[in-house]
Amino acid sequence: MPFTTSIQPRRQRLSLYTAPLHLRHKLFNAKLSPDLQKKLGVKRLPVRRGDTVMIMRGDFKGVTGKVVKVDLKKVRIYVEGATRTNSKGQTVYYPIHPSKVMIIDIDTSDKIRQKIIQRRKKE
């Protein structure tokens, strides 16, 4: 864990809960699909809004959709198709942890992200 060197679980949890937002971005790494791994030469990337992901665990297992929102505070993502109705009868997105999804297609419109992929690429 990049935030602490302690082996005590309580201190590791505390460092996760109190981590600054620029370090929380590291917690959003998700596995890439095998096709993307071969194409990009990278095993995992941080999830971003606009990526297409497949949910691998939980009630919405197998659901594929675009990432609508990324919540850095709660370390959760919101995916099209993973919805429920709240007590008012409104449809709301269900929060999903990024480690429970697999990225199927990435949004490559950002030049900085392309540089990140080139930097992480295995030779």
Swiss-Prot record:
GO cellular component, one term: large ribosomal subunit
SMART domains: KOW
Record Gene3D superfamilies: 2.30.30.30
UniProt KW ATP-binding keyword: no
PROSITE patterns in the record: RIBOSOMAL_L24
Any Gene Ontology biological process: translation
Keywords: Ribonucleoprotein, Ribosomal protein, RNA-binding, rRNA-binding
GO terms for MF: rRNA binding; structural constituent of ribosome
Superkingdom assignment: Archaea
CDD domains associated with the record: KOW_RPL26 (cd06089)
Coiled coil region boundaries: none
Summary of subunit composition and partner proteins: Part of the 50S ribosomal subunit.
Family, similarity comment: Belongs to the universal ribosomal protein uL24 family.
Described function: One of two assembly initiator proteins, it binds directly to the 5'-end of the 23S rRNA, where it nucleates assembly of the 50S subunit.
Protein name: Large ribosomal subunit protein uL24
